[in-house]
Each structure stands twice: as structure tokens, then as C-alpha cells.
């Protein structure tokens, strides 16, 4: 595991979430995030390992590291020259003056909430984000990532070409019960998972994924051989193994399709 010493001048300040804000640095085209509530960095790493054995190709690869003496993770910047990541919240507020969550929650039906988001992005960027939402919400359901919100869902804008493109799957660190204060280690995985309340469409992560359309497929044998048998045992890995067993019918085997 590599260790980095980064100056405070490289700290990046961004909008936080309900879980607080991880200290983030940007240096030499890479993003560095220190753990805040538990083992977010390890979760980012393990989830990206899983995605390397899936049918999702557009995702950010993370590596575990030490940052100024604290555990965390590092990833390459996914933005190209002249590109900016624009969150759904920022885009929605700039066009309507209203928070996207407030607009979405006007609808009582889960499907209608998702459709509102799709149609808003389609109208203002010409992007069909159906596949993006399917990928994101499927990964969240599998990994128990309850901290997805309209400030880490977004699209990418190229200011030179004046075009938009989908963002990759990233920011998965709140999954796998990584917040040890909220999901203490003395509770079983089953007990902790019962306390998961998802975002941003509904509290049930499985329903959120279902109504977005589940397309995630996993090469279970590849993941077993490349990672489960080789990675150091950890709570994050244990939670993922449990979830893969519980959700196997929801996320089919890539080799059998």
C-alpha cells in the first residue's frame, strides 16, 4: 500500500452529505480521500474490484493508500480536458431554483420519481441517463450504499464542444457498512442491513434499483478467483460476500447470459 504526503493547499472543498465530508486532496491528476467514518477507502477499492468482474465498463478504479498517515483511497481523475462534473442538484437548481429532492418527492410513486429525473436530464442535456441510473442504483442495492444523493449523481460537460456525457460509477465508499458508528461491528450483517435507509428516490435500495431497471450482471467465478480467494479478510469483504449470496437472483451470472 502506497503512502502519500500531501500539503493542505491541495485540499478540495466540496458539498458534503448526511455522513459528513471526507477530506479530499487533488494532486497530479489524482483524487485522494481520507477515511472519515470507518473503512470507506477499502470499500471503494473492493467495489471497483467487483465492477471489474461485471458488465459495467464505465467506473472509477480505486486503490487503497495512506494519506498523511491516515487510511484512504486514490483514483485517477476521470475528467478530460475542458470537462466539468455537474451534479444533478446543481443543474436542477440552476434551471428551476428548486432543490431536485424537493421536486422528486412531490411524486408518491417510485417510478414517477425516477422518470422525473430522467426527463429533466433529457430535456436539458439531451442525455438518456436510463443506463446510468440503472448501473448506479444496482451497485448501491448490492453494496448497501445508502448515501447516494443528487450531489454525487451527475453528468459531465465539455465546455469546448458544448456537449454532455454520462459520468462513470464512482463514490461508493458509504457501502458495505463502512460507517462503523452507524453500523457497529458488534451487530450482525443482517441486523445492520435492517437499518439501511436508501436515497435519493426511496428508502428501499432494492426497489430503487428495480424501478430504475436492473441490468447489472456479475462474473461470480472470476470475482471468486481473482479477489475473494486472494484479498485479505476484512469486514468489507465479508459484507460483500454476504450480499452476493443474498442477491444472486437479483444480479445474474454474467457467464450464463
Named regions from a protein language model:
Residues 1-135, 142-145, 150, 154-257:
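Anionic ligand-binding catalytic core segments
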Amino acid at each position: 500500500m502506497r503512502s502519500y504526503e500531501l500539503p493542505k493547499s491541495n485540499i478540495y472543498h466540496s458539498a458534503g452529505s448526511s455522513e459528513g465530508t471526507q477530506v479530499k486532496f487533488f494532486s497530479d491528476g489524482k483524487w485522494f480521500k481520507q477515511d472519515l467514518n470507518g473503512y470507506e477507502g477499502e470499500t471503494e477499492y473492493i467495489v471497483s474490484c467487483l465492477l471489474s468482474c461485471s458488465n459495467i465498463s464505465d467506473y472509477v478504479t480505486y486503490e487503497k493508500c495512506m494519506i498523511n498517515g491516515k487510511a484512504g483511497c486514490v483514483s485517477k481523475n476521470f475528467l478530460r480536458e475542458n470537462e466539468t462534473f455537474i451534479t444533478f442538484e446543481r443543474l436542477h437548481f440552476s434551471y428551476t431554483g428548486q432543490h431536485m429532492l424537493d421536486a422528486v418527492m412531490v411524486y408518491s410513486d417510485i417510478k414517477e420519481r425516477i422518470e422525473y429525473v430522467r426527463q429533466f436530464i433529457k430535456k436539458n442535456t439531451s442525455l438518456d441517463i436510463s443506463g446510468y441510473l440503472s448501473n448506479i442504483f444496482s451497485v448501491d442495492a448490492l453494496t448497501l450504499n445508502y448515501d447516494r444523493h443528487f450531489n454525487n449523481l451527475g453528468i459531465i460537460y465539455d465546455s469546448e464542444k458544448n456537449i454532455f456525457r454520462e459520468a462513470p460509477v464512482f463514490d461508493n465508499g458509504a457501502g458495505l457498512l463502512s460507517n462503523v458508528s452507524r453500523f457497529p461491528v458488534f451487530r450482525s450483517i443482517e441486523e445492520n442491513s435492517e437499518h439501511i435507509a436508501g436515497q435519493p428516490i426511496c428508502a428501499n435500495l432494492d426497489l430503487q434499483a428495480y424501478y430504475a431497471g436492473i441490468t447489472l450482471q456479475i462474473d461470480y467465478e472470476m470475482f471468486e478467483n481473482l479477489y475473494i480467494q486472494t484479498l485479505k479478510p476484512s469486514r468489507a469483504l465479508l459484507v460483500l460476500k454476504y450480499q452476493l449470496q443474498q442477491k444472486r437472483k437479483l444480479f445474474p451470472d454474467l457467464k450464463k447470459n
